[in-house]
Amino acid sequence: LTPEQIEGFQHALVYAKKHPKPLLDMTQADYPLPEATKKVLQDAITTTQGRWGMCLVKGFPVDEWSEADMRVAYWGMGLYIGVGRTQNRASEVINDVRDAGGSYKVKGGRGYNTNAGLDFHQDSADVVSLLCRRTAKEGGTSKVMSSIALRDRVAELRPDLLHVLESNNWFHSFQNAQDSIQPPYYRCPLMGESGGYFCARTNRKNTIAAQRDFPDVPRLTAQQVEALDLLDIIMPSEEYCYTMELERGDMQLLNSFVTLHSHTPFEDYELPDEKRHLMRLWLSIPGSQPLPPQWAEYWGDSRAGAVRGGVRGSAITEDFLRYEKRQAEIMGMPCRGFKPVVTRKEMINIVSGV
């Protein structure tokens, strides 16, 4: 960021604090950015949808912001990018990524509230954004790899497994983050293509959780286990993995369809005000790619540029629904609203027929 761009974010925050509103009531007018500062965000998102699938923006003045300030500023930035998605059982739109004593590979476990190293995975939005407020004492290194490179390597080593990865017989746990009218697990291939755009979605932890927690879910075949094992061998390879140390004031943005990400375990500081802390936004964006039709079961919509993604959770409010509709209109994005593609009853029929 240039000094001019930083000043734009600072002035917008000053305005937002002088005219305070709940986050879900805010529009761009409540966080007014000058053109030079808007362009930073627009260029970053454009970069995620291009060749690299990722972007790192450095220099946000987080040391001058309180935690509450950063939440307002970060949400304000998102208003220029897309439509924020709910991220957990509590239906929160900004997640605090820090060690809150959670466990990772357990029923209902999520990675963002632990200090554990994470499996390579994709988040449930067109773009996942992390803004670093504080770093760990040691560890927490961010790792990113191309899912296109992953597919190409599978094609070299085990081309017979590509059709397995692209099949729709994969079941994954929602980890208790679904709406009450949704089944507790969903189907989604691990790889696919639509309109010339490749996409991947893999998170072995959630695939295994569906096997562990739901006896009615069809058991993984030998070929499916082989495919998962092969991915686990390829993904951490230094040949394919880009490593970065996120610093205070860094914003990392990732395209969830063409990148996978992870981080190493970390050791935190003792004092609460020194512990590792990042904030996470999940964003549906107007320039997103099309998805294969069967991916709509999880994503809610497979159309390019449509509002989709997120996990519904159990605490959706009318305020969020109004925000979602208003922000979709501002961004020019089609929005179907929430209606499960597959209901609990329909899923029972699906698994009984597999």
Enumerate the language-model features and the residues they cover.
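Active-site environment of non-heme Fe oxygenases that use a 2-His-1-carboxylate facial triad
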Residues: 1-38, 42-43, 50, 55, ...
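A short alpha->loop->secondary-structure connector
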Residues: 74-84
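Classical protein tyrosine phosphatase
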Residues: 71
